[in-house]
Structure formats: structure tokens, C-alpha cells
């Protein structure tokens, strides 16, 4: 997070494939999407991320043509598809349930869409075989869905979707039914498949780690509007507001009060009662309240014993959890605020594993913090 860790941002040269302009949608008088604008580029893996009820699945269904918009327009490849039926949109959807036909073999499931499109019979077998080969299920072609694992069923659903060569593939929480290990494996396979096919993927999930792992771009939604749109690293390291900061991973929020501006970048502030310099890229006034945000892994901790004096926020270890590569500690500051700290394991450091109630000093590298205006005192 913060100034010194920012990426060199590469210009996005991808051409737009889907344009959503001024999209609104209500159900039973309640607006679930409000004046939404979104561009989806050719060949990218875009994730719509947000809590349940934020409108992300509704956006997916509107693009697919499974719901109709109340206002606004949807363009696909420079064609207005706002009122085009779903079957004519060159868009395929993979649902959470996979929706495979239980009485059909894997081959017949994948071939179904081609037959519905009246594809010449001579083309069907090679195209289905190619699609199954891409998802490594060629030898399972004659099995029924109930004879497959959850991960294999998911790959059949993807093969059935890509065999039609859609311009756009929509995936609605399609990994959520898998166990943890298989889910991690499928995340890698899905991203590799997307790169191989060159098809634009739009993926819906509420799982932040999944979004960070798979996406070229993440759109964070809340209450039917977009809170932030950016690369995974931008979303994680440069959150635009407290909602995004808190929704993506663990984060610590410290209360700060401006003392004075030192220069164009730095402000002298009291952070939880400790004076320090913070990087602030917007106008502030003395006495103004701010939020200073730091990820657990961006904090430094040092044990305080009777014979040493260390600068920092003073607190006491209340919980400690060994996670293999990291040690995660909960430190209670002297004012009662709880702070999460994550340290990478170092077997050569005799002070690495802290005792409960150990007195600690918490600090961070200047400029690694993200500073936001206090939304309650605007």
C-alpha cells in the first residue's frame, strides 16, 4: 500500500467489447442497479465483486439478456443488444449449478448448443472433441454428469459454453460449490483457459481472494453502484473508500487528526495519539479528521522491554496465530483499539514468536499508508 509501493501503471490498449450506459433495474419497486456505466474490454478477465445483494448477478443477467433493463443501453461489439433476445447475443453463461442435462452424456451436453444452432453435423464431433480436450475431459465424453466430480462437471459446463465460440463468457459464482483445494485448482485452470481461448470472461463472485487471483480487472459493487474499478493491485493497495478497503482483505484503520501540512505530499498528524508524518494527496486543514489505513503485513512490530525505548504506537499482544509462513497477532493499543499484524516467519529471529501480553511498539514505513478523508466528518 501507499506511495513507494505503487505500480508503474501500464496504459490499457484493449478495445471495448461491451458498453453498459446508464443501466438501471428495479425489482418490486426496489432499485437494484442505479445509472451504472461499465466498459468491458476484448480479451480481459473482469470480475464483478461485492457482497450479496449488491447487484453483481443482476448486471450479469442483463448482459446475458436474462433480464430486461428499465433504463440505459447495452452495446456488444458496437451493436445495440439492449432488446435482443438472449439466444441471439453470442453470449454464454455458466451458472453456479452448472445446469447439465443429467440424461445426456458429456459429449451430448457439449454438443447440445451446436445442434440448437443447426451446426452442420460434420462439424459437431470435431468441435466438441476440441472443447473437451481444452478442459482435459476428452476421455470422459461418454460418461453421464453424475459419474463426474464437481470440478469435472464445472469443466463440462465451461466446454459447453465455449464450444459455441461466444464473444463473451459469463460465469455466475461458478466455483462456489467446490471444496477449497479444487476451487484453488480451478481458479488457475480457468484463468489459463481464458488466456488460451482469448474469450472475454466476466466472472461474478463475493470471494475477494478469488477475484484478486483470477482477474485482470475488478469492479467492486455495493447497493447497485460501482465503488471502484481497477486492477487487483490497485484495488488492494489503493482503495478509494473505506468500504473497498474493508471488503478486500484485512485492513487496520487508524484515527488521525491533521496538525499541519509539511509539503506537497506530507502532513504532520496525530495518529491514535502518536505524532508522525503521513502522505496525503488531497487538501487538508489543521484539526481535520482522517483515516489512515494499513494492511496487517505492512506493519512493523518490536518488543518493548524495560531497558529499551522504541517509537511507535504502544500495545499488548492479545492473540497470536501461527499460520506456517506467517505469524498473525492481535495487538491491543493503549486506547483499546485492536490491530492486526502479520509477520513473515523468520526462524533466526529470537523475538519472532511473541508471548501473550507482551508489550509492543507498532510502526510502518513512511508512505506505505493509504489516507482517506473521514467519511463521517465530511
Curated annotation (Swiss-Prot):
Enzymatic reactions: ATP + H2O + polyamine-[polyamine-binding protein]Side 1 = ADP + phosphate + polyamineSide 2 + [polyamine-binding protein]Side 1
UniProt family annotation: Belongs to the ABC transporter superfamily. Spermidine/putrescine importer (TC 3.A.1.11.1) family.
Record keywords: ATP-binding, Cell inner membrane, Cell membrane, Membrane, Nucleotide-binding, Translocase, Transport
CDD domains: ABC_PotA_N
Top EC class, one word: translocase
Hydrolase found in the keyword field: no
SMART domains per the UniProt record, alphabetical: AAA (SM00382)
Subunit structure: The complex is composed of two ATP-binding proteins (PotA), two transmembrane proteins (PotB and PotC) and a solute-binding protein (PotD).
Top-level lineage group: Bacteria
Entry-linked Gene3D superfamilies: 2.40.50.100, P-loop containing nucleotide triphosphate hydrolases
EC number: 7.6.2.11
Record organism: Salmonella paratyphi A (strain ATCC 9150 / SARB42)
One GO CC term, this protein: ATP-binding cassette (ABC) transporter complex
Protein name as it appears in the record: Spermidine/putrescine import ATP-binding protein PotA
Chain positions recorded as ATP binding sites: 50-57
